[in-house]
Swiss-Prot record:
GO-annotated cellular components: cytosol
Designated gene of the protein: proS
Signal peptide location: none
Enzyme class label: ligase
Protein name according to UniProt: Proline--tRNA ligase
Length: 564
């Protein structure tokens, strides 16, 4: 491809709304352009990269036995109402009506659509197993689309769905998909972690995320360097060290004037934070109030709380709601509280604790569970953090940020039961199909790759993902010999099967080098002043090679260094 004929609108300045490297370089390099908030156009360079990523995904999905389909983007509301997700998704779901007032959604995922397809066509165990996937545009009305392709309102996703006769078979399929995902992300050259994850609005029995390690990532991960345990903080567990037992002391109400925060109470009473217990009042699905107890040095994990109640939404009670319950803000405690009380595991063997007295300016000291108040049970409700003991080997956990690029779920019968997707087994009994679902953020992968492959000048594409294999720069296209040599090398490399970009534009050498660094093609041949001595310069974008090579040897030299 000749640069003079190619559409590559590079920019000298960073976009005003771009803060992460991938957003900056993909826009500046002419890979993408924003049409509206969270909606992007893929220009020729960007589309070439996208297609290469899609082909790698297709290869491994096909090799795993999955079958490619293409489902409608527009899905009838009736299907979403069958599973209850019409209401669960809330404002994130794009909804519309046709001219007959029939309701539809623009699909953010396709569990309902694929389950409808299967229930209409599967009757017997002989029709199973099935494993489908598609690569398709999805829609989600994000409240705050940001970071370019990382969080958009329109995005490209690989979503897959498996259907099995038993949970045992479904787990085997899940493992096959898990291995396929490992192969995909390794071929993409990503430094990633597979972590335990929360099932979220998709639902199901368990799930894993594939998270690319980047500083700008929105996913917070804890992991163990020793045993390999890793989990999203929303789902992460940790080992609870047992505190030494104590003899219960007499409970006592103490005056704590206008002291509300746990840190201030601990300092005022001269006790460690581990002796304080926070009593948090939450509203579940905007209906019922509950009290949640957590140790003073820990933070409540709202995702774990929502999962405990199988709730769509949990939120802390407002000051007005606390007043309506007769509870003063800042002094909430479990004693005499007329609400169900749920405690974190960390309180199970905690004695002589400090709690609010449900009275302004007062706390109780030496309160004890069972003697002074009852709880409905002990649950894993705390957020794991760096330094907590690993739940497997008990060594300290580490914390990092990352970008979720893949998510797999064992759904069980969540969708098949609600949508009546049944099959008849060998014994003639009707049973629900066991499902799994498997997603990859295809367009997000472009950003993830750039986040890990860039420097202060631009992108450094891996060889198998670069929009072109080789970039030839003719620094002085007005010199006929330089132009002839450039075209000769261009022709020979194309005959070798390489995809080559020849920059023969009438631009300054500086502009060409800046564009070349920005778009990040891994191999570069520079035709400049050294041609007078019969040499051209061979460079690798990552800076590992920069040397003069005889013109007659440049093809062999490049082919020796090419591994795409």
């Amino acid at each position: 491809m000749l640069a003079s004929k190619f559409f590559m609108p590079t920019l000298k300045e960073n976009p005003s709304d771009a803060v992460v490297p991938s957003h900056i370089y993909l826009v500046r390099g002419g890979f993408i352009r924003s049409l509206s908030a969270g909606i992007y156009e893929y220009l020729p360079l960007g589309l070439k990269v996208l297609r290469k990523i899609e082909n790698i995904i297709r290869k491994h999905m096909d090799d795993s036995g999955a079958l490619e389909v293409l489902l409608p983007i527009l899905t009838p509301a009736e299907l979403w109402k069958e599973t209850g997700r019409w209401h669960v998704y809330g404002k994130e779901l794009f909804r519309l009506k046709d001219r007959k007032d029939a309701e539809f959604a623009l699909g953010p995922t396709h569990e309902e659509t694929i389950t409808d397809l299967v229930r209409k066509n599967v009757r017997s165990y002989k029709d199973l197993p099935l494993n489908f996937y598609q690569i398709q545009t999805k829609f989600r009305d994000e409240a705050r689309p940001r970071y370019g392709l990382i969080r958009g309102r329109e995005f490209i996703m690989k979503d897959g769905y498996s259907f099995d006769v038993s949970e045992e078979d479904a787990k085997k399929t899940y493992e096959v998909m898990k291995e396929a995902y490992h192969k995909i992300f390794k071929e993409l050259g990503l430094d990633y972690l597979m972590v335990e994850a929360d099932v979220g609005a998709i639902g199901g029995k368990f799930s894993h995320e594939f998270v690319v390690k980047v500083p700008s990532g929105e996913a917070h991960i804890v992991y163990c360097e020793k045993c390999g345990y890793a989990a999203n903080v929303e789902a992460a567990k940790f080992h609870h060290h047992k505190l030494p037992p104590e003899e219960p002391k007499p409970i006592e109400k103490v005056y704590t004037p206008d002291i509300k925060s746990v840190e201030d109470v601990a300092n005022f009473l001269n006790v460690p934070l581990t002796k304080l217990v926070k009593t948090l009042i939450y509203k579940i699905d905007d209906k019922d109030f509950v009290a949640v107890l957590i140790r003073g040095d820990r933070e409540l994990n709202e995702t774990k709380l929502a999962n405990l109640f199988k709730a769509i939404d949990v939120r802390m009670a407002t000051k007005e709601e606390l007043e309506s319950l007769g509870i003063p803000e800042g002094f909430v405690g479990p004693i005499g509280l007329n609400l169900p009380i749920y405690a974190d595991f960390s309180l199970k063997e905690l004695y002589n604790i400090v709690v609010g007295a449900n009275e302004k300016d007062y706390h109780y000291i030496n309160a004890n569970i069972d003697r002074d108040f009852k709880v409905s049970g002990f649950y894993d409700l705390a957020t794991a953090k760096e330094g907590d003991p690993c739940p497997v080997c008990h060594l300290p956990l580490k914390e990092t940020t990352g970008l979720e690029v893949g998510h797999i779920f064992l759904l069980g019968t969540k969708y098949s039961e609600s949508m009546k997707a049944y099959f008849v087994d060998k014994d003639g009994k009707e049973k629900s199909i066991i499902m799994g679902c498997y997603g990859i953020g295809v367009s997000r992968l472009i950003s993830a790759i750039v986040e890990q492959y860039h420097d202060d000048k631009g992108i450094i594409w891996p060889e198998n993902l670069a929009p072109f294999n080789v970039h030839i720069l003719v620094l002085n296209p007005k010199d006929q010999e330089s132009l002839n040599v450039g075209f000769d090398i261009y022709k020979k490399l194309k005959e070798k099967g390489l995809d080559v970009l020849l920059d023969e534009r009438d631009e300054s050498a500086g502009a060409k080098f800046k564009d070349a660094d920005l778009i990040g093609i891994p191999h570069r041949i520079v035709i400049g002043k050294a041609l007078k001595e019969g040499k051209v310069e061979y460079q690798k974008r990552d800076g590992s090679i920069k040397e003069l090579v005889d013109v007659k040897l440049i093809i062999n030299k490049l082919m020796d260094g090419y591994h795409g």
